[in-house]
């Protein structure tokens, strides 16, 4: 697949936990966890960190440089516009979108999205746990689509929510697009589990969880779910 890129969406100005992407989890910042785990994908050649022009985000350019990935800065509020221009500027024809608050993003799940997209049967594919009952635990999510689709969103999305959330227009107009939500395998079908970081409570929990289970950049999504199940036994979803 030509000109395939991952775009990681990141900024310092989180409302609930400002600066969370630089918070340390073991020996890496949250953002470093995301970047380094994405880099383990066997199918990704280019990674782009997309952030804002706010001076608070200057440090993210340094992080991108240190990790030897590409960088783009755009408008703060128009996240869709920033995302589209990042893809356009760096010549991406197919984009995998990853959020910077998911430290356990799994390269195997990213590679699976890419393989499914190669069929050209779908405009948009995701593994979000809250989308079309895909049943994935929360925190492994990513989505894939073409630059052509992204341009349609950029040109047609008018509502505030559609500019703030990159693919909201797709979900508001589901009948216009060929959508696939990948179904979780049995080992990951625990939608009640949560691994993303939005609050200080989330961060403190993940720090303890990583330390207690010696989780590393090589730990898989299946490993992480197994460790979590040792703590508590959530109801498994029947497939």
Describe each PLM feature range.
Residues 105-193, 204, 208, 223-239:
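Conserved core of the sugar-phosphate nucleotidyltransferase
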Residues 53-120:
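Short phosphate-binding loop-to-helix
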Residues 3-8, 31, 46-49:
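Hydrophobic targeting segments
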Residues 199:
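Short, conserved phosphate/pyrophosphate- and ester-handling motifs at nucleotide-, phospho-/glycolipid
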Residues 1-17:
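N-terminal nucleotide-binding beta1-loop-alpha1 segment
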Residues 46, 70, 178-180:
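Conserved beta-strand segments of alpha/beta enzyme cores
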Residues 30-47, 60, 66-67:
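A short, N-terminal amphipathic alpha-helix
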């Amino acid at each position: 697949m030509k000109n395939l890129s991952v775009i990681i969406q990141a900024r310092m100005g989180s409302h609930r936990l400002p600066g969370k992407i630089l918070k340390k989890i073991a020996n890496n910042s949250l953002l470093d966890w995301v970047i380094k785990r994405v880099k383990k994908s066997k199918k990704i050649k280019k990674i782009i960190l997309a952030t804002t022009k706010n001076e608070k985000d200057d440090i993210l350019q340094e992080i991108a440089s240190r990790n030897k990935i590409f960088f783009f800065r755009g408008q703060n509020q128009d996240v869709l516009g920033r995302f589209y221009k990042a893809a356009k500027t760096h010549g991406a024809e197919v984009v995998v979108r990853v959020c910077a608050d998911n430290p356990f993003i799994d390269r195997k799940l990213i590679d699976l999205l890419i393989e499914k997209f190669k069929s050209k049967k779908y405009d948009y594919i995701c593994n979000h746990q809250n989308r079309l009952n895909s049943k994935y635990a929360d925190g492994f999510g990513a989505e894939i689509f073409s630059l052509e689709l992204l341009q349609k969103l950029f040109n047609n999305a008018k509502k505030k929510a559609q500019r703030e959330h990159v693919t909201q227009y797709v979900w508001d107009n589901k009948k216009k697009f060929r959508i696939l939500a990948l179904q979780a395998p049995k080992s990951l079908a625990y939608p009640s589990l949560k691994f993303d970081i939005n609050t200080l409570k989330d961060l403190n929990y993940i720090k303890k969880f990583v330390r207690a289970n010696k989780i590393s950049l090589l730990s898989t999504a299946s490993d992480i779910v197994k460790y979590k199940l040792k703590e508590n036994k959530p109801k498994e979803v029947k497939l």
